[in-house]
Swiss-Prot record:
PANTHER family: QUINOLINATE SYNTHASE, CHLOROPLASTIC, QUINOLINATE SYNTHETASE A. The gene is nadA. It comes from Dehalococcoides mccartyi (strain CBDB1). This is Quinolinate synthase. Catalyzes the condensation of iminoaspartate with dihydroxyacetone phosphate to form quinolinate. Belongs to the quinolinate synthase family. Type 2 subfamily. The lineage of its organism: Bacteria, Bacillati, Chloroflexota, Dehalococcoidia, Dehalococcoidales.
């Protein structure tokens, strides 16, 4: 009853504020249910760029809300939990990227969208896990600097003819997924297909039937003719997969693959955000104008 009451108040305030609620696939189930749109980083960036709402309430981690603010400076962007950060995004700063570039002059920088606005501003083009290969292939240079995720960089390197020089960052949640977990699960579910996220270690992706972004996982699960899928990504993804495919069995590779930051946003915080119009996420204009080019170039890659 309490949850229904909060959800009702959120729906009322959303109309009053002319707001849209965007949520990442790793958010709590209650947040996914309250959202107008749930997706992966690429889908959310595209939605933020074209949405006609006056207020964007972004349920994710800070860099995602920042990306919305970069793309839609005329809109109010709210983060219900402003302390929800991203450890991988914090593994490189703008100053560190400038130093990295100075050691490899003239090379283009591909920046995973899981990064700060300052890092995006120092990059030539952004990418997500869904379009990283296409983005890298779109560049004329034979050698590319890739930040901050070394494992996504390794995934791209295997699938392109480019030389990839990666920054040694990683996602702690995906790093907890071990190859032996997949091997053990396959013994119990021999008919299952294995799908994993490209932020996983190479020895994990090597065991997968498909390596997919979370958005691609949604599409794959819907059309796959198998009834059992072993899923290697952050645990929140399982909620959406089960909700949309009740006739299929989804087995997480690891219950330890949890992003605590993604779980910080709750229904009461979402309600408070709409009630108080907090916390507003903004990007300094001198950084935004540099970062928006990298994000928009990514969105133009088909």
């Amino acid at each position: 009853m309490y949850r229904e009451l909060i959800s009702h108040k959120i729906a009322e305030l959303k109309k009053e504020r002319k707001a849209i609620i965007l949520a990442h696939n790793y958010q709590l189930g209650e947040i996914q249910d309250a959202a107008d749109f749930v997706g992966d980083s690429l889908e959310l960036a595209r939605k933020a760029a074209k949405v006609d709402a006056e207020v964007i309430v972004f349920c994710g981690v800070h860099f995602m809300a920042e990306t919305a603010a970069i793309l839609s400076p005329e809109k109010i962007v709210l983060a219900p939990e402003p302390r929800a950060g991203c450890p991988m995004a914090d593994m490189i700063s703008g100053a560190e990227l400038r130093e990295f570039k100075s050691r490899h002059p003239g090379l283009p920088v591909v920046c995973y969208v899981n990064s700060t606005a300052e890092v995006k501003a120092e990059s030539d083009i952004c990418c997500t896990s869904a379009n990283a290969v296409k983005v890298v292939e779109s560049l004329k240079s034979d050698t590319v600097l890739f930040v901050p995720d070394q494992y996504l960089g390794a995934f791209v390197k295997e699938r392109t003819s480019k030389k990839i020089i990666s920054w040694p960052g990683y996602c702690p949640s995906h790093a907890r997924i071990k190859p032996e977990d997949i091997v053990n699960l396959k013994k119990h579910y021999p008919a299952a297909k294995v799908i994993v996220h490209p932020e996983s270690r190479p020895e994990v992706t090597a065991l997968a039937d498909e390596v997919l972004s979370t958005g691609q996982m949604v599409s794959y699960a819907a059309r796959a003719d198998v009834k059992e899928l072993i899923v290697g990504t952050e645990i929140g993804m399982i909620y959406r997969l089960r909700k949309e495919n009740p006739d299929k069995l989804f087995i997480p590779v690891s219950e330890q693959a949890v992003c605590a930051n993604m779980k910080m946003t709750t229904l009461p915080k979402l309600l408070a955000s709409l009630e108080n119009m907090q916390a507003v996420v903004s990007v300094p204009e001198e950084i935004r104008v540099k970062a928006v080019g990298a994000v928009e170039r990514m969105l133009r890659v088909v």
